[in-house]
Structures are given as C-alpha cells and as structure tokens.
Amino acid sequence: IGRAMVEELLKAGANVATCSRNSDKLYQLQVQNPGSKLFTMVADVSNETDCRNFINAVIRNFSTVDILVNNAGISMRAEFHEASLDTIRKVMDINFWGVVYCTKYALPYIQQQKGDIIGVSSIAGYRGLPGRSGYSASKWALQGWMEALRTELLDSGVNVMWVCPGFTSS
C-alpha cells in the first residue's frame, strides 16, 4: 500500500517523504524514481526518537507537511493463549504508537497548512479477528485515538480520517 501511494503521489507531482526500517526498499524507491521529489529515510516508527528525527528531516527538506499518511503496520497470527506478549507489544508499538509519535511531531505543521492526517486501519478495528487479538487491539486503539483527535481538531481545518482496506498482499 505504501509503495503504491508513493508512486501515485510522485506521478501527481507531489513532494513525498517516506520512511521504513528497510534501507534496501528505500534505495529501490530512489533508483526507480530518479529526479522525483522523493525524500527517504531509514526509521522505525515504533521508536519515538526516529519519528521525531524523520519529521524534522522532512521539514528540513520540504519546509512543511500537508498530508501525513500513517501506513506502517504489521500483523500477527496466533490465538491469544499461544501469542507472545512481546509480539503483541511490537504490534501495538508499530500500529498504534507509531501513529501517535509521527502525528505528534507533524501536527504543528499540518495545523499551519490545514492539512490531513490519515491512518491506515483495518476491519479489525471494528470487529475483533480470531487469531489476531493483538492486531485487532492495535487497530481498535488507532481508530479510537483518531476519532478523539478528529473531534479535538474539528474546527481547526485539519481533516483526520482513517481507511480500512481489505486484505492486501505486501
């Protein structure tokens, strides 16, 4: 989903910044989009410092943030009684806390631009999925938090929304 968004936004002429834990994937994006307005950086969204550094680097490169798409996410497959608590924590750290961190540091710029904050969620944020308890919890948390943020920013001109794509091969 993220790669496709980057490619479509670049085709439309947008300035695009993206981060990933995978430097090889970022390098391939750069190679496949020479001369584009693309900024990439290795960062782990589950790490608050990485998120702050990424947003600061985006500001140095593009001066502002108009749209923030919180797309990073992982899943898990195990019934709760078999699931590792470390795995559930990792899912929450990436799927929920990564959104909180990136939004926290981008929000002042988005407010200046009256921009958009988008979260990529899942039907699991509305209906718990068996065998994916940690994933479902992360998406319920994401949607609840984004609904609260949307309400807080309702009169500010900032749009807050989330999308729930179906199963995607990535």
Please report, for each region that a protein language model flagged, where it lies by residue.
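Canonical Rossmann dinucleotide-binding motif of NAD(H)/NADP(H)-dependent dehydrogenases/reductases
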Residues: 1-15
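Conserved glycine-rich Rossmann-like NAD(P)H-binding loop of the short-chain dehydrogenase/reductase
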Residues: 12-27
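The beta1-alpha1 cofactor-binding region of Rossmann-like NAD(H)/NADP(H)-dependent oxidoreductases
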Residues: 43-53, 85
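Substrate-binding pocket helix/loop in short-chain dehydrogenase/reductase
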Residues: 79-80, 84-90
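Active-site loop immediately N-terminal to the catalytic Tyr-X3-Lys motif
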Residues: 80-81, 129-133
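Active-site helix of classical SDR
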Residues: 103, 138
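Residue(s) in the substrate-gating loop at a strand-loop-helix junction
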Residues: 122
